[in-house]
Amino acid sequence: MEEFQAYLELDRSRQHDFLYPLIFREYIYALAYDHGLNSSILLENLGYENKYSLLIVKRLITRMYQQNHLIISANDSNKNPFWGYNKNLYSQIISEGFAVSVEIPFSLQLISSLEEAEIIRSYNLRSIHSIFPFFEEKFPYLNYVSDVRIPYPIHLEILVQTLRYWVKDASFFHLLRLFLYEYCNWNSLITQKKWISTFSKRNPRFFLFLYNFYVCEYESIFLFLRNKSSYLRLTSSGVLFERIYFYAKIEHFVEVFDKDFPSTLWFFKDPFIHYVRYQGKSILASKNTPFLMKKWKYYLIHLWQCHFFVWSQPGKIHINQLSEHSFYFLGYFSNVRLNPSVVRSQMLENSFIIENVMKKLDTIIPIIPIIRSLAKARFCNVLGHPISKPVWADSSDFDIIDRFLLICKNLSHYYNGSSKKKNLYRIKYILRLSCIKTLARKHKSTVRVFLKRLGSELLEEFFTEEEEILSLIFPRASSTFQRLYRGRIWYLDIFYFHQ
């Protein structure tokens, strides 16, 4: 029981009590528009300027209230419908100030926890490709998978309330609610989706912090239930989702069933359940029967409804067999297929044929959505036939080739983990031919004449680094080259793409 209390009680060192004064520091608004802001920069700049400037924020808030509400153009989409000012300048400045103010103490907490665990900060970063080797290792032994999309709160107040368990600063929350009320015009309990969408687009940093904190709060409860599931009875777990009385109910629940009903205490545990999330989408997979997967499904639904007041329809969370259905995650369609193999064994005069079936994870490129994206960017038509890019025809030959190469290499690096490379070859073909057609259009020539003049040197520019290395080590016709070239390659250094 002490272990539960130690896990569930909020660490007082994590409760930051004085965020309100940070709003009035001069350097906050300089840091807010530093796009390269990270934890190390925060640490370096915390002692930069200790002067308060109440006048700065007072002027911003005053100007927000002094905007002429009548001077609004119905056709001007860039104007704030409530404040009547182009691009929401003052609201964005204040929202960025809020974001930096709450980021600073939580960044300090993260760095201090890493230092206590003696973890180097740079090593804590993980590539998004590191998820797929985990899939390859674990998922062939699992049977069921559930594709779960974390629902958005219907009201921004829910996002604010999640901070109340960690930040004990009433003044900060009064100012925060005042700002959000003026921005979103909360006249009803439920805020329409368009206001959350507008708020997230115009204040991305602030909204992302609130949303990420909401996801962190949800996962902290969910992972607690996952790790301590052997203590939860199936028929009575619903009462555990009232956050205020969460700790007391856990304690009372365990004591009562331990002392009074030892014979009816029923443990359940699923040691083979796995949870993976990226942004707002998560994957839940298990080796056991679908019964336990259904229990976890309704745990999540009740958690969202009772604790975060977010409605999620049970019918939208499907539980599928990995061997029969594929799931979409991080740009890949993945499923588990049976890979039969036949081994012939001979002992003296007798020979035996042994059939062995192994499960293997398949990762497939979603070619149709990619072709739609390429068609939208005018690299091909909707059928996937390459076309020229007339917008780039005014650039130099080097710039045109470099742009196409950058896109091709980014897509090649990311989708080299595909188990079937046919779709990847098709994407490369579209980009190569689109590049050639763009160059031919610039020089007012045909594709055939242009290729005949340049030869095959232009096509070789589209070879990726690993293709060049393999071609130097092995002959192109060798079986080793073909096997390695068709194999899956995961790049564990991919964090973002060049824009």
UniProtKB/Swiss-Prot annotation:
Classification via InterPro entries: Domain_X, Maturase_MatK, Maturase_MatK_N
Location of the protein in the cell: Plastid, Chloroplast
Keywords: Chloroplast, mRNA processing, Plastid, RNA-binding, tRNA processing
BP GO terms, sorted: mRNA processing; RNA splicing; tRNA processing
Gene Ontology MF terms in the entry: RNA binding
GO cellular component: chloroplast
Function comment: Usually encoded in the trnK tRNA gene intron. Probably assists in splicing its own and other chloroplast group II introns.
Family statement drawn from the similarity comment of this UniProt entry: Belongs to the intron maturase 2 family. MatK subfamily.
UniProt name for this protein: Maturase K
Organism: Parkinsonia aculeata
Taxonomic lineage of the native organism: Eukaryota, Viridiplantae, Streptophyta, Embryophyta, Tracheophyta
Gene that encodes it: matK
